[in-house]
Amino acid sequence: MWFKNLQIYRLPAPWAVSAEQLAADLAPHAFQPCSSLEMQSQGWVSPRENGELVYSLNKQMLLLLGTEKKLLPTTVINQVTKIKAAEIEEQQGFKPGRKQMKEIKEEVTDDLLPRAFSVWRQTWVWIDPVNGWMVVDAGSPAKADEVIKLLVKSVDKLPLETLHVAQSPVTAMTEWLVADTAPHGFTVDQDTELRATGEGKATVRYVRHTLEADDVRRHIASGKQCTRLAMTWADKISFVLTESLTIKRVTPLDVIKENADSTAQNDEERFDSDIMLMTGELSRMLADLVAALGGEVEKK
């Protein structure tokens, strides 16, 4: 198992917390299924089948946020509300007013909710207390914010901060393309996005296309900046760096897969092997990426 997206946060290095202590903090906010009148429920679930809320291996920790959401489209609510309102109008002899329509809609929603289908999703969290990383496997900041909100609620005085680097990803990626060179330990791949800073936000995208230095420089000279760049770290992991310092499309390459523990006898052992490999490599990759962006700086 590998994370696909990395929303990156900072913790003190080292962060002195045990898996047992963290699990105790999470327990009051463990996942509970939606009640008959709830649209959504969120809480911590066990990353493995042993029931523990914190998976811990080699001083690395995994958490898992579970979300249940009822599927009750607004169009369905409105249709049933319209039918119900027509029945009431016939009974009372006049159209329901705004307040009464609101009450009808609430009653319809309460009536439909217990029969609504549910969808479930899970969001993984990796905590590296040794090196001070916390990473959420989420494709958007909004999904990561759900994790952070509940984690802050669960852990008193959580020392979590946003990662701040000396050079913005946009500035750094643009400079790498202009110089036609990648930072130490990285290579530039064939996907990139160049976007103008003006009102029109004109955008050029290269997808699996060789980046011709002269063409790219012309776009940059015309006022565009690099907002997404596909890269590979140490010939081991490919990814896309974005303007917001989010890492997307994380993919372990063949050399990583070859190093996977082939002696694993079952799913549990394979999971342990994957997590040890992933956390070790990603921790080193994040450190190298921060260095490539001029190093970490304190928030002013």
UniProtKB/Swiss-Prot annotation:
Pfam families: RdgC
Family recorded in the similarity comment: Belongs to the RdgC family.
Function as written in the Swiss-Prot or TrEMBL entry: May be involved in recombination.
Name by which UniProt lists this protein: Recombination-associated protein RdgC
Cellular location(s): Cytoplasm, Nucleoid
Main location: cytoplasm
GO BP term (any one): DNA recombination
Classification via NCBIfam families: PRK00321.1-4, PRK00321.1-5
Gene Ontology cellular component list: bacterial nucleoid; cytoplasm
A GO molecular function held by the record: double-stranded DNA binding
Keyword set, alphabetical order: Cytoplasm, DNA recombination
Record-linked HAMAP family: RdgC
Transmembrane segments: none
Matches recorded under InterPro entries: RdgC
